[in-house]
Amino acid sequence: MRIKKYIVGVATSVCMCLLLFSIDVHGSEALPTAGFYADLESIEPAEPIYILTEEEQLLLKQIGVHEAGEMDVEGIAHVMQVVLNRCEDERFPDTVSEVLFQKHQFTTAKQLARMKTTEAADEALSDVMFGEYTHNEALYFESMKGKVWSRIHTYQFSYGGHDFYK
């Protein structure tokens, strides 16, 4: 899971090289910086930022569908991202399986073996693996208002009837 930080570092280095190359090629000419930076935001990484086993991918799709309920691709992806955020946080276990089956955490995880996945879950997993939701830094979420535990965490955002916390 620590590969994400490495890839971000490599991507930053590549962008700096491209910028320096552009300066060298254009010399004293004005650089098309506005278009250059706008184009960078639309570039998707060629490799996933998360390297997951087939079992981890299946578990993420199952928990995403189950916990997100009737939510769309984005809602499923937010749930998946919470699990991956926990894998990268030192306060939690390091693997998807360990995070999901950690005592008193994902209480529905015991039912995952019976859960079916959906095309929306496939799309959400692809989006998450390629860094589409890394802005979601949440470690917790809940779908019911008024739970005491959520009051001790920092609110991040709401989506599809779920509140996400850090």
Model feature map: region roles:
Residues 1-54, 166:
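N-terminal secretory targeting signals
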Residues 33-166:
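Bacterial extracytoplasmic/cell-wall-associated proteins, especially those involved in peptidoglycan
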